[in-house]
Amino acid sequence: MATGKILQITGVVIDAEFPADSLPQIYNALEIPLGQGRPSLICEVQQQLGDSVVRAVAMSTTDGLVRGMDVINTGAPISVPVGPETLGRVFDVQGRPIDGEGPVGTTKTMPIHRPAPTFEEQSNRAELFETGIKVIDLIAPFTKGGKTGVFGGAGVGKTVIIQELISNIAKEQSGYSVFAGVGERSREGNDLIHEMKDSKIPGTDQTVFDKTVMVFGQMNEPPGARLRVALSALTMAEYFREEGRDVLLFVDNIFRFTQAGSEVSALLGRMPSQVGYQPTLGTEMGELQERITSTKTGSITSLQAVYVPADDYTDPAPATTFAHLDATISLERSISEKGIYPAVDPLASTSRILDPNIVGEEHYRVATEVQRMLQRYKDLQDIIAILGVEELSDDDKLTVSRARKLERFFSQPFGVAEVFTNIPGKYVAVGDTVKSFARVLAGEFDHIPESFFFMKGRIDDVVAAFDASKQ
C-alpha cells in the first residue's frame, strides 16, 4: 500500500501527493491515520489532478487534519460488511457499526462501487407486491423487484409511509429490509430504530429490527458520506439478492443523495448545470438506480422517499428520479390538510403494473372506476363552490356522495402512527381492498354516512361502526 502526503485541505476536500508509480485510482479509498486512539479518516478519490496529485472527498469531518500528514492508498474502494450478521445492526457509510453493540460477526465485505447486473442476469417478470396499504395496493401497486417513489413536500408523511411498510413487510412477509437514511433528521432515525425494536413479529420472539439492516448518513454528516451512504446500503441489499432472497431497500431521502452530489460537485470545482445542480446528475442517479433491480436469483424491491423542493415537480432532482421508477406515489398537501392519511393523491399516483394482464380484470376495473369517480368529483367542485350541492343533478349528487366516501375510505390507521392516533394499525390484503371498493362503487353502502368510512381498514369495520352507532 503506497503512502502519500496531504498537500491541501479545503473543507472536506483533500489534495494528496503520491509517488508517480502508485497513483490511486478513481473511487479508491484513502486512509488517514489520526492517532490518539481515534479511528482513521477515510476519503474517496474523485479526481487525478496531474503531477501525482489526487483530489479526494472525506467521509467524515476533517477537523484536526494538517498538511504533511500521511495518506495511505488502500488500493480498493470503500468496502462494507455483508451477510445475515448485519441484520439488527446500525452502520455508517463505511460499514462501521454505530449502535454500540460491538464489532459485526462477519468477515465478508463487498466494495460499494459495483457494476449493475447485465441484461442476461436481469429478470423481466412483472408481479404485484402486497403492502397492506389500501390506496397503494389499489391505485399504484408495487412491482416485485421494482422501484417506487414516494413524492411529497415537507411534512406530508413520506417517512411514516416508509416506516409502516418496513413494519408490514417484516410482520406479514417475514422479509429482510435494508434502510438507508440519506441526509435526513437524526431524530427520525433514532425514533425509527426504537419503533422497530418495540414492534414484535407475530408468532415469534423477534422484532422488526432483527430483520432490518440500517445504514445512516444523516444531515449533520459531510456531503461525501451523504453521497455514498445509499451505495453502502445497496451493496448490503445486493448480497441478500445474490443469495436468492427477495429484499426490500428503503431510501429516505433520495433527494438528499442528489443534494450531496451537488455539494461535492461544487467543492470539486465543476461548473454547475441548471438550478445549480451538478452536471453529472443523470449519470450519478443512473449508476445507483440501475443496480436496484431483479435478477434470476433474487430481487431488490425499492421504495424511495423523494422530497420535492417547494412542491415543484419540475425541479431537476425529482424530475430525474421520475425516469427510473415503476410506480409513483404522490402525497398531496391538500389531502393531508383534510386530515386524510396516508395523504396519497389517487389521481396523480401511477403504476406500470396497473394492467389487467398482471393485476387481473377486477382489480383494474375497480381502480379505474374509482379514479373516474374521483375525477368527476374534482370537476364538479367549482360548481359546488359557486352554486352548492343542491343544484347538481341526481346522478352527480350520487357521484359526489360516493366519491367523498371513497376519499375517506382511502384513509387507514397505521401501526407506527398508533401513538398519535390511538387507533390500532390495520393491514388490508389486496383481495379485501378490491372487494371493499367494488362494493362502495356499487352503492351497497349509500345509506352509511361518510364519517363512518374515515380511518377504517376493511369495509366490515365501517359496517360494524355504523351498526354500533345505532344501538
UniProtKB/Swiss-Prot annotation:
SMART domains: AAA. GO terms for molecular function: ATP binding; ATP hydrolysis activity; proton-transporting ATP synthase activity, rotational mechanism. Signal peptide: none annotated. It is a peripheral membrane protein. It is found in: Cell membrane. InterPro entries: AAA+_ATPase (IPR003593), ATP-synt_VA_C (IPR055190), ATP_synth_F1_bsu (IPR005722), ATPase_a/bsu_AS (IPR020003), ATPase_alpha/beta_chains (IPR050053), ATPase_F1/V1/A1_a/bsu_N (IPR004100), ATPase_F1/V1/A1_a/bsu_N_sf (IPR036121), ATPase_F1/V1/A1_a/bsu_nucl-bd (IPR000194). Its EC number is 7.1.2.2. The keyword Phosphoprotein does not apply. Keywords: ATP synthesis, ATP-binding, Cell membrane, CF(1), Hydrogen ion transport, Ion transport, Membrane, Nucleotide-binding, Translocase, Transport. GO terms for cellular component: plasma membrane; proton-transporting ATP synthase complex. The keyword Cell membrane applies. It holds the Pfam family ATP-synt_ab. It catalyses: ATP + H2O + 4 H(+)(in) = ADP + phosphate + 5 H(+)(out). ATP binds at residues 152-159. Its main location: membrane. Produces ATP from ADP in the presence of a proton gradient across the membrane. The catalytic sites are hosted primarily by the beta subunits. NCBIfam families: atpD. Belongs to the ATPase alpha/beta chains family. This is ATP synthase subunit beta. It comes from Herpetosiphon aurantiacus (Herpetosiphon giganteus).
